[in-house]
Amino acid sequence: MLDAKKIATTVKDLVKPISDNLGFRLFDVEFKPENGWVLRIIIDKEGGVTIDDCEELSKRVSALLDVEDVITSSYFLEVSSPGLTRELKEKWHYEFFKGKYARLYLKEKIDNKQEYAGYIDSVEDDTLVLRLLDKTLKIPFDKIAKARLDVEKW
């Protein structure tokens, strides 16, 4: 059986130097079953990612993975930008998007709520500081179940 997390981590380590060399920030790598296996590589760069950027990285990664033979089953390779409502998984994602509006779903309630939306104020060690309308909330990263950038509600 395939170890999806291990494959994603290995691919991430292999792809990062190529991504960096092309001027991209490697945002995430996922390997998931979706009507067959999908290797999803998500990149970003200042000014945004173009289709040509995705195509260039896809060609290079495809050639590399053919040689490295990390994935033993058939799969689809998908290279894309993270999109407007990108998921925030790594600590650096929060630092990178400081000042942006985000929606967080917590593993357990804080102040009697399990979902918060506000501005990413800062990162302090292992804690996210989220600026809400009426207060600032400190949320330990290990309490966050899922987080993503969101579009402000008017």
UniProtKB/Swiss-Prot annotation:
Cellular component terms per the entry's GO annotation: cytosol
GO biological process, one term: translation
InterPro entries (alphabetical): Ribosome_maturation_RimP, RimP_C, RimP_C_sf, RimP_N, RimP_N_sf
SUPFAM superfamilies documented for this protein: YhbC-like, C-terminal domain (SSF74942), YhbC-like, N-terminal domain (SSF75420)
Subcellular location: Cytoplasm
Keywords: Cytoplasm, Ribosome biogenesis
Transmembrane regions: none
Pfam family, any one: DUF150_C
Function: Required for maturation of 30S ribosomal subunits.
HAMAP family: RimP
Family: Belongs to the RimP family.
Protein name: Ribosome maturation factor RimP
Provenance organism: Hydrogenobaculum sp. (strain Y04AAS1)
Gene that encodes it: rimP
